[in-house]
Amino acid sequence: IKLFLSDETIDKFRGIEQTVNAPAINKTDANKTAVNKKEQSLAIVYEDDEVLVVNKASGMLSQKAKKEDRSLVEYITDYLMTRQQQQDSVFRPGICNRLDRNTTGLIVAGKTVESLQYLNRLFKERELHKYYLCIVKGCIAQKETIDGYLQKEEKSNKVTIQKAKKEGSVRILTAYEPLEYGRYQKEEYTLLKVDLITGKSHQIRAHLQSIGHPLIGDH
């Protein structure tokens, strides 16, 4: 899944982007050098004493898939450790939402036990909403909520969408609203704002493709 965000949209979320710059360091300090290199991958959108919001880069894992992986969680932990915000605490920051590896977008992290628990509750109870911007093939003229059932094949990690419930399938709901429409090389495209009412693997791409509007790059 690819997430396409305009500069204007990003600016609305973050005000002025803060990109973490590595401070001057002693060249003989290999550990600090490694940490500073990791810091450069963090684009901080918002930060206070309790919360950190970053714009995850494409290609970066939200969380480890394997023990040897370096994910956004490790980058955030290193960033806070270098600023002595977590050195005297057994608590390590955690993220409250995840994005696919190739998806760019905002991820929220709690810097304290209390803030992490509070933010997780907001996400779980849908008091805090996540929206995705994506470009799809074809013209979509009006906003709509679509319903269906998602069937996942675990071995191949592929999903199919059906209108009726089958054994092993789960119900999905996807709401979308068209924001812009245009043409490119005689093809029609629509920029959508998507709200995952249910959040399942590959839901956006599979559900939109099932109604004849695949994400660009998927057709």
Where are these predicted regions, by residue range?
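RNA pseudouridine synthases
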Residues: I1-H219
